Amino acid sequence: MQILLAALVAYLIGSVSFAVVVSSVMGLADPRSYGSKNPGATNVLRSGNKKAAILTLVGDAFKGWIAVWLARHFGLPDVAVAWVAIAVFLGHLYPVFFRFQGGKGVATAAGVLLAVHPVLGLATALTWLIVAFFFRYSSLAALVAAVFAPVFDVFLFGTPGHNPVAWAVLAMSVLLVWRHRGNISKLLAGQESRIGDKKKAAADGGAQDGGKA
């Protein structure tokens, strides 16, 4: 019962879509209506509002971090922490508050990894930054970081074995790659948008939806 309750709370925390909330508060178009239609920081950046994108990034990462931190703060066993990690991540992917139309989980996964172990989170984030800096593709950076996260985990803690948190990290990585399957096709076809690209639809949407709740 304790694990179920912790996972439920984590899922609800993850279901808060900061991309949608921040955009609404700042009078911007719903990020699900333009660009990649993904409610995440990279797509919010396409609106041209860097502040909104940063707030989205921080908010999505924070909810992943706080869910796992709380689980450990209250002394829950590793199996509960693992389920909390997966639940908050799934909450972001399929948020109950937003008709289950969620993001791809990059920032939330980063927050989870930082809470699991700061070095694990920082190593994965650094991997994302390096790939993003050289190639300017957020999706490619996310895919590479997702592949390397379990590898970093093995280097830090050894093979997963009976460590449920390590298996949770692996599960999140697999889910994150699966959520980027459309991006993989675009990358292979040379049609993927680069970081910082602004969509005319975003600007038009912002002008039309500005001031709406």
Curated annotation (Swiss-Prot):
Any one of the GO BP annotations: phospholipid biosynthetic process
Q: Which UniProt keywords apply?
A: Cell inner membrane, Cell membrane, Lipid biosynthesis, Lipid metabolism, Membrane, Phospholipid biosynthesis, Phospholipid metabolism, Transferase, Transmembrane, Transmembrane helix
Gene Ontology cellular component annotations, sorted alphabetically: plasma membrane
The entry's localization annotation reads: Cell inner membrane
Residues annotated as transmembrane: 3-23, 51-71, 78-98, 115-135, 140-160
What reaction is this protein's catalytic activity? Answer: an acyl phosphate + sn-glycerol 3-phosphate = a 1-acyl-sn-glycero-3-phosphate + phosphate
Topology relative to the membrane: Multi-pass membrane protein
- EC number assigned by the record: 2.3.1.275
Please state the pathway this protein functions in, per its UniProt record: Lipid metabolism; phospholipid metabolism
> Which coarse location class describes where this protein primarily resides?
membrane
Matching entries from Pfam families are given as: G3P_acyltransf
Which GO molecular function annotation, any one, does this entry have? acyl-phosphate glycerol-3-phosphate acyltransferase activity
Q: Outline what the protein does.
A: Catalyzes the transfer of an acyl group from acyl-phosphate (acyl-PO(4)) to glycerol-3-phosphate (G3P) to form lysophosphatidic acid (LPA). This enzyme utilizes acyl-phosphate as fatty acyl donor, but not acyl-CoA or acyl-ACP.
Q: Which family does it belong to?
A: Belongs to the PlsY family.
* Description of how the protein assembles with itself and partners: Probably interacts with PlsX.
Q: What is this protein called?
A: Glycerol-3-phosphate acyltransferase
Organism listed in the record: Burkholderia cenocepacia (strain ATCC BAA-245 / DSM 16553 / LMG 16656 / NCTC 13227 / J2315 / CF5610) (Burkholderia cepacia (strain J2315))
